[in-house]
Structure formats: structure tokens, C-alpha cells
From Swiss-Prot:
The gene is murB. It is found in: Cytoplasm. It comes from Buchnera aphidicola subsp. Acyrthosiphon pisum (strain APS) (Acyrthosiphon pisum symbiotic bacterium). Cell wall formation. This is UDP-N-acetylenolpyruvoylglucosamine reductase. It holds the Pfam family MurB_C. GO terms for molecular function: FAD binding; UDP-N-acetylmuramate dehydrogenase activity. The keyword Cytoplasm applies. GO terms for cellular component: cytosol.
Length: 356
């Protein structure tokens, strides 16, 4: 018999970093794959909606959830040393930042640029997390997913994961009745520092170490970003838009907007800069507000509702589109009463405008 924790009509406030006070019919913590299989099977047979969360760091619950919220606490790390690289086999319930610290302390380098990113290993793969010039896809070797239909485990190697900016195949083809249970991370023994442009003011290439990069990034993030334990937030609410080179050049000429050319020919534009330079004056809806130091983050100052967060986001979305002709797409997952809701249903996203 697999041990599980059951709670009835429990508040989800402490289980989502936005600290939105909604409830679920049941909240169940699972520590084994078999427990996850058992619970999902019961839900399927009983026609009960269910959703799997890690740290709840990239979600916004729009209302009370009528089904079961499964909290993934499936943990375990196996490190295999090869001649030229390290291979990490990590279960999806492990916290990402804990893995970064562990590897650094063991002298296994390469994850330091992704320090202090909230969430678990599973969401790191699903969202293809990234910061300071490094993304999860750059270190991923494979992702293991569990089919909650037939209980089989399938290994998907990096090239088949369809990783892109804050996206992967796990947000699309495998988003329903599948769960990320384990990832493989490959780190070369020949460490090379990644000095992203925004780090240049804080660090010099002379005598640079992974520890220095880690400490500086942690310091920057703590200074710029709100601690979700103190101020409710889900990190960046919107994605940085990707636009065509010609359109980007016009914006650069007009506004000198921070931009980052991509390998696919598109240009990434700073969404935070767009919001900051719209110059919203004391924009706040109830307890929902824009963070003062990082404009891309929407915060719950105390007791904000999801409706207040969404209303604020809609105003920003509309204003940026009107002034810059750029469509901001939400990065957070929106959760309705029985599951995820497409952002297009709320923000009226026009797919034709995603690349302009």
C-alpha cells in the first residue's frame, strides 16, 4: 500500500506562489510513481478532473478547482560519471535550485546560470526554463514521461522534445494524461562560462569561476525579483515577444529597445522594457500590481484575487499592443475550475500577430 496524504477542501494558497486563495476538492501529495498512477486512475474511473503541480510557481488559479490537485514530491538523484561528462538522472519532484546547488558543491559545473529559478525539475523541462544565456534544452539529454492511460514510461530524447522559447512538446502533444517523471541532464567536464550581456556590469572574465557566476546571479535575482514567500507572484507573467527583424529594427530605431537576435532569424524584445516605457502611472487593481523593480512581474500585494490579476494583465496587454503593435503572450499557465485554460480565450490572442 502506497502512503498518500489526503486533504478535503483545502486552500491552495500555500501551494501556488501567486498566493491566490482558492480551494480544491482534494489535495494529494505523492512520493512515488505508483502513487501517481493509483490516484490518476481513480480520478479517471470516477470522471474527476485532476492536475499535477510541483511548486505551483508558474500557475494562476482563476477559480476554485473542482477536482484533485496532485502535488508531485517524487524525488531522487542519480549521478553517473563518464570520461568527458556527467550524466544526472533526476526525478521531477526535486526542486530545481536545490539541484543547481548540489551539483555546484560536487564540482559538477554548468547549471550556475539557472540559479534561484523557482519550481521543480518537471516544470523546468515543460517550460524550458532559461536565464542569463542558458536554457534547459542546452543541458537536457532526455525527458521520461509517464502515460497515465496505460502506465507506460516513454523516454523522449532532446531532439524530439521540440524545445523553443518557454515551450516544449510537453505543453502540447503530451500535456494531457501524461506526466514528466524524470529528466536526464548532461554536463561537460570542460566547463566554459556563459557571460550573458546583462552580467557584464557585475563580473569580469578574469579568474571567473562557476561559484562567482552562481553567487552574482543569486544576488541579482534577490535584488531585482520579489521573493514569493513574502510577495505573491509567478515570476514573469508575460513572455518576451519574438518578432521579425524588420519590425524589430523599427522599434530599435524609435525607442532603442533592448533586443536579442535569435538563431532562427527572429529578434527577442524585452517585455519588461515595453511595460516600463509605457509609463503606467500607479496602475493597481485591488491588491494586484506591477512590481516596481521588475515590470514583467505582476504581484499579489496581499489579498489579490485572480480576477484582479487578470484585469491588470489585460490592461497591460491592450496598452502594449496599442503603442508598440506587439502582442504580449502570458507565460503563466491559467487554471480554471476543471483544468488549464488557453490564454487565447482570455486575452484574445491572434495567432497571426505572434510574429510581426
Amino acid at each position: 500500500m502506497h502512503k498518500k496524504k489526503y486533504f478535503s477542501s483545502q486552500s491552495l494558497k500555500d501551494l501556488n506562489t501567486f498566493a491566490i486563495d482558492v480551494t480544491a476538492k482534494k489535495i494529494i501529495f505523492v512520493k512515488t510513481i505508483q502513487s501517481l498512477i493509483d490516484i490518476s486512475k481513480i480520478c479517471q474511473l470516477s470522471n474527476i478532473p485532476y492536475i499535477i503541480l510541483g511548486e505551483g510557481s508558474n500557475v494562476l488559479f482563476l477559480e476554485n478547482y473542482v477536482g484533485v490537485v496532485i502535488i508531485n514530491r517524487i524525488k531522487g538523484i542519480k549521478i553517473v560519471e563518464k570520461k568527458n561528462f556527467w550524466l544526472l538522472h533526476v526525478f521531477s519532484g526535486e526542486k530545481w535550485h536545490n539541484l543547481v546547488k548540489l551539483t555546484l558543491n560536487l564540482g559538477i559545473l554548468g547549471l550556475e546560470n539557472l540559479a534561484l529559478i523557482p519550481g521543480c525539475i518537471g516544470s523546468a523541462a515543460i517550460q524550458n526554463i532559461g536565464a542569463y544565456g542558458l536554457e534547459f534544452k542546452d543541458v537536457c539529454q532526455y525527458v521520461d514521461i509517464l502515460s497515465l492511460k496505460d502506465n507506460t514510461i516513454k523516454r523522449i530524447y532532446k531532439n524530439s522534445c521540440k524545445f523553443s522559447y518557454r515551450n516544449s512538446i510537453f505543453k502540447d502533444q503530451y500535456k494531457n494524461e501524461h506526466a514528466v517523471i524524470r529528466v536526464g541532464i548532461k554536463l561537460s567536464k570542460k566547463w566554459r562560462p556563459i557571460l550573458f550581456s546583462s552580467l557584464e556590469n557585475y563580473i569580469t572574465p578574469i579568474n571567473i569561476t562557476a561559484y562567482k557566476i552562481f553567487n552574482i546571479i543569486c544576488k541579482i535575482r534577490k535584488k531585482k525579483l520579489p521573493d514569493p514567500k513574502k510577495i505573491g507572484n509567478a515570476g514573469s507573467f508575460f513572455k518576451n515577444p519574438l518578432i521579425k527583424k524588420k519590425k524589430a529594427q523599427k522599434l530599435i530605431n524609435l525607442y532603442k529597445v533592448p533586443n536579442y537576435p535569435q538563431k532562427n532569424g527572429l529578434v527577442k524584445i524585452s517585455a519588461a522594457w515595453l511595460i516600463e516605457n509605457y509609463k503606467f502611472k500607479h496602475l493597481q487593481i485591488g491588491d494586484a500590481a506591477i512590481h516596481k523593480k521588475q515590470k514583467l512581474i505582476l504581484i499579489n500585494k496581499k489579498n489579490a484575487t485572480a480576477q484582479e490579476i487578470i484585469k491588470l494583465a489585460k490592461i497591460i496587454h491592450k496598452c502594449i499592443l496599442k503603442k508598440f503593435n506587439i502582442l504580449l503572450e502570458p507565460e503563466v499557465d491559467l487554471i480554471g475550475a476543471s483544468g488549464k485554460i488557453k490564454a487565447s480565450k482570455i486575452f484574445k490572442l491572434n495567432s497571426k500577430l505572434k510574429v510581426i
